[in-house]
Amino acid sequence: MSGNTLGTLFTVTTFGESHGPAIGCVIDGCPPGMGLTEADIQIELDRRKPGTSRHVTQRQEADEVEILSGVFEGVTTGTPIALLIRNTDQRSKDYGNIVETFRPGHADYTYWQKYGIRDYRGGGRSSARLTAPIVGAGAVAKKWLRERFGVEVRGYMSGLGEIDVPFVDWSHVHENPFFSPNAAVVPELEAYMDALRKDGDSIGARIDVVASGVPVGWGEPVFDRLDADIAKAMMSINAVKGVEIGAGFDSVAQRGSVHGDELTPAGFVGNHAGGVLGGISTGQDITVSIAIKPTSSIRTPRRSITKSGDEATVETFGRHDPCVGIRATPIAESMLALVLIDHALRHRAQCGDVETSTPKIAGSAT
């Protein structure tokens, strides 16, 4: 199956299925000499793992990572880094009723028509379970970006269903299971999810991600633009149906006199472009928003067809996230970090010695 690798110089190839013995990834292109332990990776995996609150899937996976290669005496060697996460709480019997039937909104039908075979247990390869290795690889990327350039990649939930979550402070994000930057909204989010679970339904979410400290110059026009690669990576996350960079779709209603970010000796006056111009980073914060659709696995009976093309009714059982967006923040952060480290290495390879006489201005004039 092709399409399992992300990146050009810093590559990540994932493997495994939701109910297989293990999942994992192979990272190639990581620079040598960086300190790296399983604890460095585990801290990020623990932010994404299931079973952490009543609002997410109750599948109990420890998601304990094993570093199989690429690290010697706690230091990266420059050779491929293999990460392994063993599946320990599969419950395949929950999927016995969909062996011959396609679940609406899932990849069951498309995988079957493309490959002529599918692993029906938890969605197999198409499961969001496969985002765990992405978060593991993202931990490596985050560490290198932070230590080498001071880049910080952080995210938060900015909307759940009809509820907007206004940003208050980053310190709130780690204090609740929603990654909400506004502690005052958390009780409303909890009540909303409790009612949704009783209804046997699901809902979508919006996640915002910000990368600060990114230098000017990263990105490869025309077809490997930084924002294009970010959009591709974000759309590779399960259930993501929309991506915005900067002002995004709000740009439609903005006039050029408003949208164009003016430059002054003191810095940029605005950041409607989201930190990217011409596919190249400006030195400002890179701002990304993603829209995540409602979970397709719900208890409400829905119409579908069987492999024979006959009408069928599907009721989904098993342990599922009523809103996959609740655990998506560390995944989106990881995807952004993976794109950034790849472009950092590509920039260093081609333009690392380039210097200009023009001062690098601040990301914000204020």
From Swiss-Prot:
Query: Cofactor note from UniProt?
Result: Reduced FMN (FMNH(2)).
Q: What is its EC number?
A: 4.2.3.5
What terms describe the molecular function in GO for this protein?
A: chorismate synthase activity; FMN binding
**Catalytic activity annotation:** 5-O-(1-carboxyvinyl)-3-phosphoshikimate = chorismate + phosphate
Q: Which cofactor does it need?
A: FMNH2
The record's Pfam families line, in alphabetical order, gives: Chorismate_synt
A single GO BP: chorismate biosynthetic process
Biological or metabolic pathway of the protein? Metabolic intermediate biosynthesis; chorismate biosynthesis; chorismate from D-erythrose 4-phosphate and phosphoenolpyruvate: step 7/7
Which CDD domains does this entry report, sorted A to Z? Chorismate_synthase
Q: What does the entry list under GO cellular component?
A: cytosol
* Protein residues bound to NADP(+): R48, R54
Domain of life here? Bacteria
Amino-acid positions noted as binding FMN in the UniProt annotation, renumbered to this chain? R125, S126, S127, N238, A239, G278, K293, P294, T295, S296, S297, R319
Q: What does this protein do?
A: This reaction introduces a second double bond into the aromatic ring system.
Q: Describe the subunit structure.
A: Homotetramer.
The protein, known as = Chorismate synthase
Encoding gene per record: aroC
